[in-house]
Design a protein with these regions (language model features):
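Short coil-to-beta microelement around the adenine-binding A-loop and adjacent beta1/P-loop entry
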Residues: 14-15, 73, 128
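The feature captures the beta-strand-to-loop junction immediately N-terminal to the Walker
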Residues: 33-35
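Helix-to-loop junction immediately C-terminal to a conserved catalytic motif
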Residues: 48
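Conserved ABC transporter NBD signature motif
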Residues: 56-67
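Conserved ABC ATPase "signature" region
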Residues: 63-64, 99, 110-129
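ABC ATPase NBD coupling module
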Residues: 65-80, 110-111
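Short coil-to-helix segment of the ABC ATPase nucleotide-binding domain corresponding to the Q-loop/switch region
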Residues: 92-101
């Protein structure tokens, strides 16, 4: 669950996000739309503290992540985000690209991550591409 209260973000005198209040329930799908330059990406980056909000608070799964004492790296282990511009590592196989994060973050062992990756690849009929 995510609660956003009074979230604002400014770059100098340019306020790009102004006083956003939002509640996102578990499993809820949310779409953020708007014209170029309206603050969509900045808002998303603030949600996982890739950008520090100027003011306001964000509560994720009962923990205020905007609290300076919050362990944001631990919190991010339980968050997912797809970046606007993302790329795969060309020097890694499909399987290695999929398993990189769960192994590096110690969420899964290599064996567990590979089994889950193969399960997901099979769901989309791409298991034969695992070593590509």
């Amino acid at each position: 669950m995510i609660y956003v209260k009074g979230l604002s973000k400014s770059y100098g005198d340019n306020q790009v996000i102004k006083n956003i209040d939002m509640h996102i329930a578990p499993g809820e799908k949310v779409v953020i739309i708007g014209p170029s330059g309206s603050g969509k990406s900045t808002f998303l980056r603030c949600l996982n503290l890739l950008e520090q909000p100027t003011s306001g608070s964000i509560v994720f799964d009962g923990q205020e992540i905007t609290d300076p004492k919050a362990d944001i790296n631990e919190i991010r282990r339980h968050m997912g985000m797809v970046f606007q511009h993302f790329n795969l590592f060309n020097n890694l196989t499909v399987l290695d690209n999929i398993t990189l994060a769960p192994i590096k973050l110690k969420i899964m062992t290599k064996k567990e991550a590979e089994a889950e990756a193969m399960r997901l690849l099979k769901l989309v009929n791409l298991e034969e591409k695992a070593s590509a």
